[in-house]
Curated annotation (Swiss-Prot):
The gene is argF. Carbamoyl phosphate binds at S56, T57, R58, T59, Q83, R107, H134, P135, C136, Q137, C263, L264, R291. Gene3D superfamilies: Aspartate/ornithine carbamoyltransferase (3.40.50.1370). This is Ornithine carbamoyltransferase. Reversibly catalyzes the transfer of the carbamoyl group from carbamoyl phosphate (CP) to the N(epsilon) atom of ornithine (ORN) to produce L-citrulline. It comes from Cupriavidus pinatubonensis (strain JMP 134 / LMG 1197) (Cupriavidus necator (strain JMP 134)). It comes from the Bacteria. The lineage of its organism: Bacteria, Pseudomonadati, Pseudomonadota, Betaproteobacteria, Burkholderiales. L-ornithine binds at N165, D223, S227, M228. Pathway: Amino-acid biosynthesis; L-arginine biosynthesis; L-arginine from L-ornithine and carbamoyl phosphate: step 1/3.
């Protein structure tokens, strides 16, 4: 085992291709241990603080179960039940919380919040989701693709839907891991250039036609049309995105062995047809489970280094 200095995971670009190669293989090993009921407690007596400003099912469950399976335990905090919701400065909260725990996961709104927190933390901080990025989910998605089809390098991932935190994280992943990213969204919901790194220009292709975006894709993926915090726009978004539902016709334009993914929760009949998400090309349940395994690998790496 090798040690590593304090490292945060705030966006996908925070790690190198070499680190991702290690993490993805480590997730495979930890998943095998989980399936074989092997005890592995490298984080014995370590504490994870989970801070939630946004509600969650999969994020809380996967992190809480994951730290337990690694021998540690979790403490849940939300803004309703802590001083974070009563105006305590983020910098002060980071100083205090990071003196009492070993690692911190935050699910919040603006990326600036988690960046400020990490800047004053004495322990690793993990992005459990922000408005801008969702790195743990895309890490799970990449792992799922590799598990099902092998290397993602040189492949094409098609994103059909909103320019949200998942889309921006996929762009970073394409740059880091060497695949092409097709993006298609209706007018008015295009990518923010400020969140698209110049280094990813060679991997990104933008399409007006979602069918065209799916052509040649090895993976087609999407997300809800209305993310948390944008509920007031829901009806307008439904009208704008009605031609951006992932359909069997879109999957037929992709590669014959293409997969479908969705980070969940899904709305059948909106961003995806039931026939697609419940069909043979969908791997959404493996994708959801794999949050557990990649996050275990991530926490182990941030606290213990490489094994």
């Amino acid at each position: 085992m090798s040690s590593t200095p304090i490292k945060h995971y705030l966006q996908f670009s925070d790690l190198t291709p070499d680190e991702y190669e290690y993490l993805l293989d480590r997730a495979r090993i930890l998943k095998a241990k989980f399936k074989n009921y092997e005890t592995w407690h490298p984080l014995h007596d370590r504490t994870l603080a989970m801070i939630f400003e946004k509600n969650s099912t999969r994020t809380r469950l996967s992190f809480e179960a994951g730290i337990h399976q690694l021998g540690g335990h979790a403490v849940f905090l939300n803004t309703r039940d802590s001083q974070l919701g009563r105006g305590e400065p983020i910098e002060d909260a980071a100083q205090v919380i990071s003196r009492m725990v070993d690692i911190i996961m935050i699910r919040t709104f603006g990326q600036d919040i988690i960046e400020r927190f990490a800047a004053h933390s004495r322990v690793p901080v993990i992005n459990g989701l922000t408005n801008e990025y969702h790195p743990c989910q895309v890490l799970a998605d990449v792992f799922t693709y590799i598990e099902q089809r092998g290397s993602i390098r040189g492949k094409t991932v098609a994103w059909i839907g909103d320019a949200n935190n998942m889309a921006y994280t996929w762009i970073q992943a394409a740059e880091r891991l060497g695949f092409t990213f097709h993006f298609s969204a209706p007018p008015g919901y295009q990518l923010d250039p400020a969140l698209v790194p110049a280094s990813a220009a060679g991997q990104l292709k933008v399409f007006e036609d979602p069918l065209a975006a799916c052509k040649g894709a090895s993976l087609v993926t999407t997300d809800v049309w209305t993310s948390m915090g944008f509920e007031a726009e829901n009806e307008a978004r439904k009208r704008a995105f009605q031609n951006w539902m992932v359909t069997t016709a879109m999957m037929d334009r992709a590669e014959p062995d293409a997969l479908f993914m969705h980070c969940l929760p899904a709305h059948r009949g909106e961003e995806v047809e039931a026939a697609v998400i419940d069909g043979p090309k969908s791997v959404v349940w493996d994708e959801a489970e794999n949050r557990l395994h990649v996050q275990k690998a991530l926490m182990e790496y941030l606290l213990c280094g490489r094994y």
